Amino acid sequence: QSQLQEQVLRENQEKGGNRSTGQSGKESKTMAENKAGAETETAETDERMASDANPDIRVLLCSDNYASEYHDRITITADVPFRVSGQGTEWHYQAGEQVEFTMQSNEFLQGDLVFTMEEDGVFQLPYLKRATECPSYEGSLHVEKREEGLILINTLPLETYLCYVVPSEMPSSYPIEALKAQAVCARCYAMLQMENSRCEEFGADLDDSVSYQVYNNI
């Protein structure tokens, strides 16, 4: 009987060891899967946070001397090759080529047009009167024809936008701490406008005049 008990005990120990080994393998696999899933989720979260931290802002560019939201004519060029997309068609232009249109340009403005650069550079608006004779704009440009006139929107990352707002609102000769404070205020204000836009009727978050905060008047 003693031998029988010992044999049963050994068998139970072996079975228990096998179950323990099998469970350990399953747990290891589950832990590895959970770790991989967590790493993927973390990467996606970081990407979303980076995007959320520097979202695109849409700026309605007013006409000469900020007189109106509408333009009678628009002339656009760039210091790099650029393209114009709209109406299911795409046009390509070389650096320095100008695209000009007015309210009478019906064949060209049957719908919205989007201007994008094919490499890093800036768009230039030689017709527009600002502090400089030919103001430059990063990002993309959006042109739309309405009954009242042409509207022009500049879309670019928020942080890039702020680089053009701060020197437009405050001289660069001011103390650095004052400039930092201005940047913080400008960012908070811009993000508030992005959440509760008064320019939504134009498809923009705000405009470039003193009605909001002056943009790219340097």
What are these regions (language model features)?
Residues 1-218:
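Conserved, single-site charged/polar hotspot
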